[in-house]
């Protein structure tokens, strides 16, 4: 059995998030932390990804690492990828590809599958800043995937119900409006080919509009499995295979699920915000109160 782990990357600075945030339904710490202040930080991140792959046994004897770069013309990064392409690592080799920077990570997933679909039996998709780095991470996923009838996509972060704003553009409804955070997860080549046949691609947006990339990629790709009669399934609740890169690199313990108190506080804040946001005046008043409260708790020195 041959398998491929696809890592989507892009040599640009990213939105700064020092800690993961609560998002999704069910609620979890799935809005992952990330600290990538420059393109060179991304080069270092790719090196870190590779260092982990060299250390960790994926549980499958033939696993290649495919790194797909959404090219923004960063020469140092492009040269680095060129240098490591073909490099042998334990259990396989590194393959690097450059493509036009369209469709974000989800366009990169399509590119990798389109190019290599006849070489591998399973594909595992992730982004460079969410690390799938636990012993036997590939074997565990394949075993879980094959233990479910009609499994189409195994979410390596978690599945989530999606907002009604996505219903119309993706032709969704209450029964099938489910996706997976980051479109991070595993599927078989057999099923991916069925998705590809129906849509002519692994779903993504052929452009750079951020919200459309999320709609037609992060939401559209995982939900496409449901549309062809399969299911999105999850890892057991206590099993964590994917960790934000920033947490792992700084040795910060990653917490996937919130406590009951954290859940209550999250929904309490959201309810209060909705109440005060009925007008710009009340919202401004509420935000001023919050600012004053924060200054009282943690005054600037």
Place the predicted regions along the sequence by residue.
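Short beta-strand-to-loop acidic/aromatic patch adjacent to the donor-nucleotide binding site
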Residues: 120-131
């Amino acid at each position: 059995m041959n398998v491929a782990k696809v890592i989507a990357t892009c040599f640009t600075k990213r939105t700064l998030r020092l800690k993961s945030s609560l998002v999704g339904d069910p609620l979890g710490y799935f809005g992952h932390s990330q600290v990538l202040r420059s393109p060179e930080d991304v080069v270092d991140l790719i090196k870190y990804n590779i260092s982990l792959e060299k250390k960790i046994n994926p549980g499958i004897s033939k696993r290649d690492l495919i790194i797909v770069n959404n090219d923004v013309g960063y020469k140092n990064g492009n040269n680095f990828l060129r240098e490591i392409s073909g490099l042998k690592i334990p259990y396989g080799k590194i393959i690097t590809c450059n493509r036009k920077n369209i469709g974000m990570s989800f366009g990169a997933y399509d590119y990798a599958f389109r190019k290599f679909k006849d070489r591998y039996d399973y594909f595992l998709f992730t982004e460079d800043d969410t690390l799938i780095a636990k012993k036997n991470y590939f074997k565990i996923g394949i075993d879980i995937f094959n233990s479910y009838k009609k499994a189409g996509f195994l979410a390596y972060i978690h599945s989530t119900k999606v907002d009604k704003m996505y219903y119309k553009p993706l032709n969704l409804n209450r029964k099938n409006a489910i996706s997976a955070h980051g479109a991070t997860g595993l599927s078989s080549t057999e099923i991916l080919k069925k998705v590809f046949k129906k849509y002519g691609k692994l779903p993504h947006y052929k452009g750079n509009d951020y919200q459309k990339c999320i709609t037609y990629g992060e939401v559209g790709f995982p939900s496409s499995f449901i549309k062809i009669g399969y299911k999105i399934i999850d890892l057991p609740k206590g099993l964590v295979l994917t960790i934000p890169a920033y947490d792992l690199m700084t040795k910060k313990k990653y917490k996937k699920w919130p406590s009951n108190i954290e859940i209550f506080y999250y929904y309490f804040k959201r309810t209060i915000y909705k109440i005060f946001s009925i007008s710009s005046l009340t919202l401004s008043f509420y935000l001023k109160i919050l600012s004053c409260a924060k200054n009282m708790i943690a005054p600037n020195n």
